[in-house]
Regions:
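Short flexible/disordered coil segments
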Residues: 108-115, 177-202, 234-239
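Short amphipathic alpha-helical segments
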Residues: 1-2, 103-111, 199, 240-250
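Short, flexible loop segments at boundaries between secondary-structure elements
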Residues: 185-227
């Protein structure tokens, strides 16, 4: 990792933080809006799981948005974040209630990673870098991704990953937009696209290298159900999708 990467990353975090208003308890009655979470000292709260200091990671995992860090259910996770900020030993997954995160543990095993431990080759973030003032899902707005796509592109150019793994259609389309990829036709069936030879999509990083952007199903309960045609919530199809990523890794 080079010092210019550290400087560029720190500068990016500052600018993203400044682009969002600060949250106060009164904001919960404002309707669904995004704010900055002041305890987040990384680009995203997900980065505390995998990504702190990993600015040469080969694999970037990208979700839609983190959700609401003020939600009571996620206070154990936030306590771990605060420990990390104090350079204390921490475990992002300690009492973590997220089914998405639990399924990711199984999916990353297909790539040979045990993500219950620190993995210097991984960097986790969400495309939308602000935080909901209430609720954990639903009500997603494409304008949120438009606001942050330039920041995401900067982040990818800093890290220079080989593969960018996108959880869900909105995330995949947002990442392609960040790289100004113009598709000739709209994706009509996301499951079919995941399985097609058009996946992954090659994009060019600022350094001229190619990164491969993978369309993947979201691995939360609803995304998994959709990937299985509403028939089950098992991970077999997603495990098969993830196996295809291996060919693009060293």
């Amino acid at each position: 990792m080079h010092i210019n990467k550290e400087h560029a990353y720190s500068n990016l975090v500052i600018r993203v933080r400044q682009s969002y208003p600060s949250y106060s308890e009164s904001k919960i009655d404002d309707g669904l809006r995004l704010y900055w979470f002041n305890d987040c000292e990384e680009i995203n709260l997900w980065t505390y799981w995998q990504g702190r200091g990993n600015l040469d990671a080969q694999i970037m995992l990208v979700g839609q948005d983190w959700g609401c860090p003020w939600d009571p259910n996620y206070q154990p996770t936030i306590e771990q974040v605060r420990k990390a900020n104090q350079n204390d030993e921490y475990d992002y997954l300690n009492n973590n209630p997220s089914p998405t995160d639990a399924n990711l543990i199984a999916l990353f095993k297909e790539l040979g990673y045990i993500i219950t431990e620190p993995c210097p080759n991984l960097f986790f973030t969400n495309l939308v870098l602000g935080y909901r003032n209430k609720g954990l899902s639903g009500g997603y707005r494409k304008a949120w991704a438009r606001q942050d796509k330039g920041y995401f592109k900067e982040l990818a150019d800093i890290i220079e990953p080989t593969v960018i793994l996108c959880l869900g259609r909105s995330t995949f389309e947002g990442v392609l937009s960040a790289f100004d990829v113009k598709r000739s036709s709209r994706i009509k069936n996301y499951n079919a696209f995941i399985e097609s030879t058009n996946n992954p999509v090659a994009v060019t990083l600022e350094n001229g290298k190619t990164a491969y952007v993978f369309a993947l199903a979201h691995c939360g309960a609803m995304g998994t159900l959709n990937r299985n045609g509403k028939k089950s919530t098992d991970l077999e199809k997603q495990l098969a999708d993830w196996r295809k990523i291996r060919a693009y890794l060293d």
